Each structure stands twice: as structure tokens, then as C-alpha cells.
Amino acid sequence: MAEMEKEGRPPENKRSRKPAHPVKREINEEMKNFAENTMNELLGWYGYDKVELKDGEDIEFRSYTTDGESRQHISVLKENSLPKPKLPEDSVISSYNISTGYSGLATGNGLSDSPAGSKDHGNVPIIVPLIPPPFIKPPAEDEVSNVQIMCAWCQKVGIKRYSLSMGSEVKSFCSEKCFAACRRAYFKRNKARDEDGHAESFPQQHYAKETPRLAFKNNCELLVCDWCKHIRHTKEYLDFGDGERRLQFCSAKCLNQYKMDIFYKETQANLPAGLCGTLHPHMESKAEGTGVQLLTPDSWNIPLTDARRKAPSPVAAAGQSQGPGPSSSTTVSPSDTANCSVTKIPTPVPKSLPISETPSIPPVSVQPPASIGPPLGVPPRSPPMVMTNRGPVPLPIFMEQQIIQQIRPPFIRGPPHHASNPNSPLSNPMLPGIGPPPGGPRNLGPTSSPMHRPMLSPHIHPPSTPTMPGNPPGLLPPPPPGAPLPSLPFPPVSMMPNGPMPVPQMMNFGLPSLAPLVPPPTLLVPYPVIVPLPVPIPIPIPIPHVNDSKPPNGFSSNGESFVPSAPGDSSAAGGKAGGRSLSPRDSKQGSSKSADSPPGSSGQALSLAPSERGRGEVVDLTRRAASPAGAGGQPGFAGVLHGPQDGVIDLTVGHRARLHNVIHRALHAHVKAEREPGAAERRTCGGCRDGHCSPPAAGDPGPGAPAGPEAAAACNVIVNGTRSAPAEAKGAEPPPEQPPPPAPPKKLLSPEEPAVNELESVKENNCASNCHLDGEVTKKLMGEEALAGGDKSDPNLNNPADEDHAYALRMLPKTGCVIQPVPKPAEKAAMTPCVISSPMLSAGPEDLEPPLKRRCLRIRNQNK
């Protein structure tokens, strides 16, 4: 080709070298063979015979000579492409053809008896035997050549191209398109019929009448979907009983759509007049009027007051109510309804509803009424009457009552038992303040109007119909008969009765007349009511002490710690230790030793059961420094604070069960009350203690001297559970706050006394460390103190020097735990001798025991 173009051949030669017709003929032959083979294969799959193709079956439109024919055929194709309503076969073949008057169709047997026409085109119809019973009658060529027929599928007039014999009738088609469509539909119908076995079950005559499409009748049943009207090739044809007939649907989708349509129709028919506009009678398919309001999810939220403002449209449907209930509106007997409702006109709602307009109240769905039906004789224009078990009630009023009932508690909804008395003024059980006006019933407007307008409006509309004796007892009786007051169509609220209104008997209390909108006292409010519930709050409670342990007179139990009383108390009573902030652990150990001390000291020493020692290892001692200085000569109990805080006792306690108990009490006790020694004296006292009672300053007052007010100051205690001297020294670093009151004169323990004290301390420490029971130590101390001589054969047990040891720390269960007093900030330096020297700590238990013993004795003596 390119060479020819290079040679300069004119393009006409190129075009002339492409004879379209021969090539097309070859393609047509191939296509014919392919189409024939494919169609035969497909038909063979479904068990049908092959299709016989003949030479003249492939019709080309370009071969038509007459323009009319071609236009006619083209128009048929165009119209086939558009959706057109199909008529039943009977009308297609018989009546419609007769009316059209085409000569090409005979009405007798449906066969094509058209006269022979021109044989110009030599058209031969395709013979397609779909099923064995219907046979294909190949008409003579003279009959088929150019016959004008009405296509059995598209129902257009055209040249007969194909004909299909269906038993007693022959269908003619104007084109292959129509023929294929008809054959496909017929095939699907047969297939569905064969698979579902509905052919012999149900008569299908109604399909030919209801379906807009062409329904084929071949002495067999048709399976047309009752919803989509299609002939489906499917196994899912579903039977659905609809009254006296059975419906068939090609799929669950169609069935569901049908059900929704029925539901829509029924619901629309049962809606109140205001919610749906003009509706046709109940079972009519769809409302045709333009005023129809579709049932949408919003319809349920439309306030009834808005709906009532529209004049109720005629609804002949049975029952428009959503629930039963005592009807407080115009309850008329069936006879009255039949006679009066014809002329009764619904009263329009007053336009002014300023106070109680309740558009916000959505319709409340309640139980369906017992029986809903239009009373006999009610014309379609009258408001719908709801037949309840208490008589016919106008629908709008019935709906109002349902809403009002939802406001009232359910137990108030019962029928009033005094209904039998027509003369008793009856209050509306829906609203406590609503009742007939004193002057008798007032009509809403025209006395003929039964429409009892909203009970929630400020205009109270009592029923206008007198009580009928035939009404069921559950029906709320209307007010007693009386002359209607047409001049007061809407009695104002002020005319409501003021006296107590009778209520149902099940409510045994009279309700005073309330405003129409005042909620009843038993109104069920859907709001949460906050009820105060007691919430347990943890309150620290002092641990119960041993029977013999009493809180010292000077101590007030404050949770964990005992707050010392005022220093004056300590000075006043020798037995009152007011200045000691005593934790339970202090009391456990120290006071266990002094529990049996004389009554004066017994108050100071809180002896707790040994079992209580196991509590937490950290003791919170909040001391109140009643006086700047601890009880005279109590620096030994002045807690050694790590920090300068006055009221904090830092207890660095080892994890030994005993070390909990080594918390010292700052005693306000009059430890043979002595004046507060100066710094030098304190140093001396410290020296006494460390040096085993080097003689204290001579200035120390006698043990009986009352401690100065400073003596009441509590001391911070540091318990160092380590034996190492450095640790104790660290723990012993006194915060400046606690001026450990100078060691009580201790009667200036002579150096010999420390030895005796050491002996006793050895004894007591042995007992404590071996027995690990402060109870035993307590017993020992109790014995010693009670005998005042010391059952322990301690010569210095009652030694005034031992008693004077204000620095004497309580006997520690373990020798390595030393509690050291904390001096005042100014006297920090003075207290340095009070710190137990490391050599003493490292000297061994015997070196440590004498100071410990001395401390125990001092504590005991102080308690004395």
C-alpha cells in the first residue's frame, strides 16, 4: 500500500481496490455461521432444538425499495427501543387487531392469513421451536413475503419477519429484535414454571389483566412477579398469601417492596386526619390528591396541635387512633353519633394558644384501641370516630386523651367509680384542675360540634354531650346535662371550679382544683432525682490500747499521736505528762514500762499490747510544743529531729518489729521537776548520759521542782535502728527547735549510779532483747515501780539520780536503736554531749546497756 502511494496512484484507486460488498458478504457468511452455531449451542444447553437458518433470514434494511416500508420499519425499531406498555395477548391478537382493522390479521385462530403480497424480498421467517407443544408452522412464502402485521411484541405495524406458532396461535414479529425479546421472555417464564412447579398450582388469569406487559398463554400457568411485573428466570418465586389470592414474587426484594407498599397504605389510612391529607377509602392503592402528606419519619414528630390546626380531611379509613383510653371528649352513644355526626363540623382550634400551646408534645404511641371502626351512618366528611370499648370518640379528641394520659400516672387512668351519678361534677382525670364549669357544660361553639378541642389549651372545653346511661362504665361521663351556653364557646380558665375535684376512687385523696396546666402532685417526672447517699469517709481512729493503758491526762488522743496538754497541766499534776507527743508506738514501748507507775505517771505512760507493735514502721507524731522547753529535764525525750520542724518526729526505724516501738514521748511529767538547766547543764547531762552520768550541773533543781513551762515542749524523736554510731549520730543531730530540757537533775547521779543503772539496763535490755516483748519489760517496770524498790534488785531503781535522768531514753528493745533529744536551735551546741558517742555504741552491748538502762530508769522515775 505504501509502495502504491509512493508510486503516485490516485486515492481513488486505493478506495476502488476495497470492494465493500464482497468482503461484507464473506463476513456475513462467517457471522451467520457463528450466530447459528452459538444459538444452537445455547439452545442445546437448555434442551431446545436447533434453529434452522435459511438463506433469506438475514434481512438488510437497505434492500427495501419503498421509502415507506423502510421508514415504517425504522420507526418500529425506534419505538421498540422506547418503553411501551404491553397489552395482554388476547387483546393483541383479537380485539385490538379487530379494532385496528388491519386486513393482515385474522381473528379466528390467530394464524396469519394475510393475502400473498409481493415476493420482492423473499423473506422467510425463522422457525424457532422453543418447546415441543407449540409447533412452528412455516407459512407459505406467498403469505410471508410482504405482509403488514402487528408485531406480537412491540405491537407496531410492520412487515412480518418472523412468526412463532404457539399451539393454537401464531405470533408474528416485525423484527428479529422483537422476536428475540419475546422468545427470551417466554423461555424465562417456562424455565421458572418448570423449576418452581407452579404451573398447575394457581390460576394465572389475573396476570393477563394486571400486568402491563405482554403475558403469554400457552395452556400453562404464567409466573409473572406481582410487584415488578417481570417474567423472571429465577427459582426464587415466593408465594405470599394476600387474602383470597396468592401472590408470587420473583425475589425477596420485590416481596419486601410489596409489603412496604401495603404497610404504607395501611398506615396512611390509619393516620390522624391532620397528619395525612385527603385520602381515599381505606384500600385504595394510593392517594391521588395533591394535598396528600407522605408518611415519612418526620410525620411521627409532627405535633398534634399543628396537625389539628388543619381542618380534618375526610377519612373513611377504619380507626385513626393510636391507642385506647378513657375518652374525656364528646362521648356519644352510637345512636347519637349516627344522627348527629352527619351535621357536626369540626371546630377549628382557637388561634390563640399562648399559655398552654403544646406543639412540643410529640404523638405518644400507645396500645391499639380495643376496636376501631367508623360508626354506622357517619358520612365521609365527618371527623373520624374511634370506636373504643367505651363508645365512639372523635379521633382528634381521642389522640389528645392519649397524650394527656401519658402525662398522668397510669394508676389515675382508671374509670371513675362515681361516673354513675350524672349530676356529680366530674373532673377530667387527665388533668386535675380540668372539670366542668360550675354553671353547667359549656359547648365549644355550635352545640352540634362534637370536636372537643385540645384539653391543653387555656380554654377548657368540657364535653358537650350529656352522659348516656348506656355508656360503658370505663367511659368518662360528660358533665351533667345543662343548658349549653353558646355565648361561652371557650370558657376561660377563671371559670373553672375552685372546690376539690372528685377523682377516681383508686386515688383516696382529694385533689384541689388546680390550674389546667399545673401538674398533678403525683406527676411522674423523667428527671433524675439526686438522693444524698452516705459516703463513708475514712476517719483515723486511735488504736485501742491495753486495758491498763490510759491516755495520759495531759494527752488528747489525736488519731495516731497524742497531743500534749498545756504545760501548766504538766506542772500542776505531777502525774500529768502534758508535753509529750506520744504516738501509739511510744506508748507501746515506753508506757508499757511505766504502766504500773504511780497514778500520776500512769497517765503519761500508755502501755499498748505488744501485739500492737507490729503496725507501720513510720509513726507520725504531731506534737504540740506546749512550752518551748520540754518538761524539765526531758531532753532525753526531746525527739531528735532531722529537720528544724517543731512538730515533726522523724523516725528512721529499721525493719525490725521492735524498732517501731522505739519512739520516745516528750514527757511533760514532772521528772522530779527541775528548772531547765542551761546549756552547760545540758552538756553536763549529756555527759552524764554518755559518760554514764557524770554529775550534772549543780544548779539542777530538785526532782520535786516543777518543770518550767518550757518543760512542756514536746521533742522530736529520731529513731535510728542502726547500731552504727555514725548513723545514730546522724539521727541524733538535733533540730534546733527542741531545747531538750536539761536533764532532770537526776539528783546528780554520781558515777557509781551509772554502774548500777548499767546493771539494771543490762537486766532490762536482756529481758527485752531476749524476750522481744515490751510486755515483759512493762511487767518488769511495773513491778519495779510498784514496789518502788525494784523487784529487779536494782539498788538504784528508786535512786533519785535515776529518776532525775530526763535524758534517759526509754529502753530500746534492741541496743542499736538510740533516740536522742533535739535541742533548741540556740542550744544545739549545748546538746552535743547528749549524743551517744560512737565509742559507747561500738563498745558492745554492755557499754550500750547502761545508758539504755539509765534511760529506762529515768523514764520510770519521771513517771513516778
Swiss-Prot record:
Motif SUMO interaction motif 2 (SIM) location, chain numbering: 648-652
Biased composition (Low complexity): 314-335, 417-433, 565-582, 590-603
Region Disordered: start-end pairs: 1-25, 304-360, 413-484, 550-616, 725-750
Record's compositionally biased regions (Pro residues): 460-484, 733-745
GO MF annotations in UniProt: SUMO polymer binding; zinc ion binding
Keyword check for Ubl conjugation: yes
InterPro entries: RAI2/SOBP, Znf_MYM
Source organism, top-level taxon: Eukaryota
Alphabetized UniProt keyword annotations: Isopeptide bond, Metal-binding, Phosphoprotein, Repeat, Ubl conjugation, Zinc, Zinc-finger
Biased composition (Basic and acidic residues): 1-14
ZnF (FCS-type) intervals: 142-180, 216-256
Crosslink position(s): Glycyl lysine isopeptide (Lys-Gly) (interchain with G-Cter in SUMO2): 672
Gene Ontology biological-process entries: animal organ development; cochlea development; cognition; inner ear morphogenesis; locomotory behavior; sensory perception of sound
Modified residues (Phosphoserine): 627, 694
Cellular component GO terms, alphabetical: nucleus
Motif (SUMO interaction motif 1 (SIM)): 618-622
Function text: Implicated in development of the cochlea.
Record family assignment: Belongs to the SOBP family.
Quaternary structure annotation from Swiss-Prot or TrEMBL: Interacts (via SIM domains) with SUMO1 and SUMO2.
Stated name of the protein: Sine oculis-binding protein homolog
Gene name, Swiss-Prot/TrEMBL: Sobp
